[in-house]
């Protein structure tokens, strides 16, 4: 250990690295045998086999095995014997062929090893590691610990691969848009004004303009439209966006999107360009050829068949609407649902009889809880027996005619062993309930192929949806989406020229053609309840721009974090972001957000009214 700590003491006097790095650790292959190389990295693991020291040296590219023994490499042996996990070292040595018995097919460098002629210690570890970083360690580390010591977490192979994958995706986006399609990258402001876009804004007081506030952008939407008015034609940006909203696994208060806007292009042309972009990303990053064009579903078809507007089509389990069959049913729950303007739908589950018991469907069961969380009051069911007859609760069986029974079996394609789960009530609740059950059952039954890639467009969204809490219409996407030209006579029921790209049940991109005429934009503002004065106050700059020759235009934005999450096979976007926030919107590494000096608040002419609970 004497030489080790002597080396540490000399670090302060070491002004430069002794030798240029010749390779990254993970790059070395058989073709490099015989070369003398210099590597830098961290000790991933150290092993002593009969007096011979083996080190796994790690950098962002991977791992390579380093060997030091007292006979062949006496100059490096003493220091090699003193090294520990996560020490930072410089190693110079010869690339040699590994002996047959020590070949390691699990790593790309597994055919070679480095005989270390020289080892320099660049830095040590002075505190006990909060968790093991080594790629050989399989312990499950608590996420809060990983986020607090993110600099250690990012050294781990999985995280290093994820961050590099993210870089590859962004690089592919830039290359295709610039080199193939002629887009230009333009930065838009981070400090802007607060505009109603759905979620809460993050707001910042202005010191030089007391009483006035900036907002961080929820998206570059308005600026990119103004860029089209400015003649920029094909714009893109890897944009940082901010939304003060409740968080979940695939949401963050600050996130990144690929933002695009194009002038003089139809909806069809925009979709085709984006299919080629996405296909290029998959081929470049994943080596996967995607068949073009992608399938399309209208919003109405997606809701009818899957109960949601972002269906996972890797498995079937499609919903069946039997409202017309049940409108005259003797079963009051079904009959009343239809009479009150609602629907009755069925989720048919092959082999459901065998795997799903009545206990799970009734109150207290897991499927009942799933339905309740979606707003359903209960679950009705029919089981198809081996003889083709049905089993269900008496209230349904006694009030189902033979004709209705046969129509249900025929429409659902139900065979012996099928379980039919019913949803009845308002359309939104029924669809949400059966969508959740569909996803839960697909996971339980192993119906989802994790290697399958299903991309599809959902098109023809409604322009507006009803906000029951505020008792008004609101834009389903945003109020700058252009209505379908055939529906201009009735904006309230109009379809939008909008399109979402869905990847294995996740919305990864959403866009639309935009309104580019002032009078249409003003009509949309009026439809969502904005008075002319409010519209002028919040969006006057956009309306003014529309007076000066605005081209037809449209665009799309991709959620970069979510797209990379799916590429990486992760379940949370926190695992593909270098420094994410928790679900409580905190950075555990820096302990942000934090308090500030009263002096700073005074300079900003603000004060906090928050009083901590005693």
Curated annotation (Swiss-Prot):
Subcellular compartments: Cytoplasm
Residues that coordinate or bind ATP: 243-245, 252, 507, 559-562
SUPFAM superfamilies: Class II aaRS and biotin synthetases (SSF55681), GAD domain-like (SSF55261), Nucleic acid-binding proteins (SSF50249)
Swiss-Prot/TrEMBL keywords: Aminoacyl-tRNA synthetase, ATP-binding, Cytoplasm, Ligase, Nucleotide-binding, Protein biosynthesis
GO MF assignments: aspartate-tRNA ligase activity; aspartate-tRNA(Asn) ligase activity; ATP binding; nucleic acid binding
Catalytic function, reaction form: tRNA(Asx) + L-aspartate + ATP = L-aspartyl-tRNA(Asx) + AMP + diphosphate
PROSITE patterns with a match to the protein in the record: AA_TRNA_LIGASE_II
Subunit structure comment from the entry: Homodimer.
Name of the protein this chain belongs to: Aspartate--tRNA(Asp/Asn) ligase
Organism encoding this protein: Trichormus variabilis (strain ATCC 29413 / PCC 7937) (Anabaena variabilis)
Lineage summary: Bacteria, Bacillati, Cyanobacteriota, Cyanophyceae, Nostocales
Gene that encodes it: aspS
